[in-house]
Amino acid sequence: MRLMLLGGPGAGKGTQASLLINRYKIPQISTGDMLRAAIAKGTPLGLSAQKIMESGGLVSDDIIIGLVKERLKNPDCDRGFLFDGFPRTLVQAEALKDAEIHLDHVIEIAVDDEEIIERISGRRIHQPSGRVYHVVNQPPKNPGVDDITGEPLIQRDDDKEETIRKRLQVYHSQTAPLVQYYKEWAESGSKEAPKFHTISGTGTVEQIFDNIVTILET
């Protein structure tokens, strides 16, 4: 089962990814994790990436693809894998295709921008414990304070509306075109193309997961 999840920030990809890797016993392949592991091991690709990152540059798609190919040789990928945060751009998607790294399913979890903003901007954190609340979906007993300690809750900078809107702009300009790319490829009838599905990201975690499993196992 070789999977990729697409969707905006706050669409629920991380939650569903955790459930999917547990159900299908496949690893979650994260470019960030791969970079850190390659640098720690001192592999040639890792050392190349480290030099670029230390100089403040962006790691090239060639290096990222090389790391992906290296990672997929590990025995834990024999049953498949789930891509997390990769590819992010059309250039990376084309590079993945050229490298003949095949996918079975690409699933877009679709959520309206305004709902994403409400989901993320409503989060409140109790920093010392890491407890998370939501002003609408999981409010504290008393507004603005932690249930257990009575200490104040904060809103992280990443959860502020202005920051979320900027992240959504980046998503729509860079990553959302992947939806069209994989949709058109699937519709082309190519044997190499993964199946493409769009599901609603609105509903309970369990409902969304059941919808994904139905797609994958039908």
UniProtKB/Swiss-Prot annotation:
InterPro entries: Adenyl_kin_sub, Adenylat/UMP-CMP_kin, Adenylat_kinase_CS, Adenylate_kinase_lid-dom, P-loop_NTPase. Residues 30-59 are annotated as: NMP. Residues 122-159 are annotated as: LID. Transmembrane segments: none annotated. CDD domains: ADK. GO terms for biological process: AMP salvage. SUPFAM superfamilies: P-loop containing nucleoside triphosphate hydrolases. AMP binds at residues 31, 36, 57-59, 85-88, 92, 156, 167. It is found in: Cytoplasm. GO terms for molecular function: adenylate kinase activity; ATP binding. It holds the Pfam family ADK. Its EC number is 2.7.4.3. Keywords: ATP-binding, Cytoplasm, Kinase, Nucleotide biosynthesis, Nucleotide-binding, Transferase. Catalyzes the reversible transfer of the terminal phosphate group between ATP and AMP. Plays an important role in cellular energy homeostasis and in adenine nucleotide metabolism. Consists of three domains, a large central CORE domain and two small peripheral domains, NMPbind and LID, which undergo movements during catalysis. The LID domain closes over the site of phosphoryl transfer upon ATP binding. Assembling and dissambling the active center during each catalytic cycle provides an effective means to prevent ATP hydrolysis. Monomer. Belongs to the adenylate kinase family. HAMAP family: Adenylate_kinase_Adk. PANTHER family: NUCLEOTIDE KINASE. This is Adenylate kinase. It comes from Legionella pneumophila (strain Corby). The gene is adk.
